Amino acid sequence: MTQKKESFFWTSYSDLMTSLFFVMLVLFILVIVLLHKRMEATETQLLEIKRVEQSTKDLSRDYFQYRPDYKKYVLTIQVRYPAGKSDLKDMITTDKDAQLRQLAAAGCEIRDFLKNHNENQYILIIEGQASKDNFLYNYELSYQRALGLMRFWIEDSNITFGNNCEILISGSGDGKLDTHSMRETSNEKENQRFLIHILHKNIFEHNENK
């Protein structure tokens, strides 16, 4: 009788361990499959980011210079303002009409880029900067300058940037608050400029849906 009980115990124990082994095996396989899918998704995302970064190089070097250290474009058209001014009409230049034509051409360049890549959704950020001086409101001023450029493109130059683009206006001031914004140290006046960010919106949506 005792021998039968022991035999039944070991048989049940063996069945239990076998079941646990198969459960652990299934879980192990499931984890491997999930990790493989995650790796594939990450690789696809990296390829997408590289493709987008490459596509933004379509922007003309006549008007834009890409800075890989900050991953931003600098609008190469030199714009100089009197202290405290944000209107493009107040620019300090020897040929204001030529300067405005160049700015309009730069806006058209962005418009054409967005049109040529209309299968994607983008965030376009126009960032204004200011040089350090005695003016107390350079952060507000840099925003107003970026807003002035956007209005010039849309209202004065009749440039439409399409439905695949969300436009944001920002100002990073004169660097007094040490926000680690992109700054030039050799010539402070060089910080009176516009920075252009073109971000691929699809990438952010892909991350949210994962």
Predicted regions: what they are:
Residues 44-47, 98-101, 144, 148:
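A general alpha-helical scaffold signature found inside nucleotide-binding enzyme cores
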Residues 87-125, 154, 196, 204, ...:
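Periplasmic peptidoglycan-binding/anchoring modules of Gram-negative envelope and division proteins
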Residues 66-106, 133-136:
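Short, solvent-exposed beta-strand/turn patches at coil↔beta or beta↔helix junctions
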Residues 127-200:
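Periplasmic OmpA-like peptidoglycan-binding domain that tethers envelope proteins to the cell wall
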Residues 69-77, 84, 120-122, 165, ...:
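Envelope-exposed proteins and targeting segments
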Residues 86-88, 138, 182, 209-210:
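Short coil/turn segments at secondary-structure boundaries
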Residues 1-53:
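Short terminal targeting/anchoring segments
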Residues 44-63, 68-71:
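PAS/LOV and related PAS-like sensory modules
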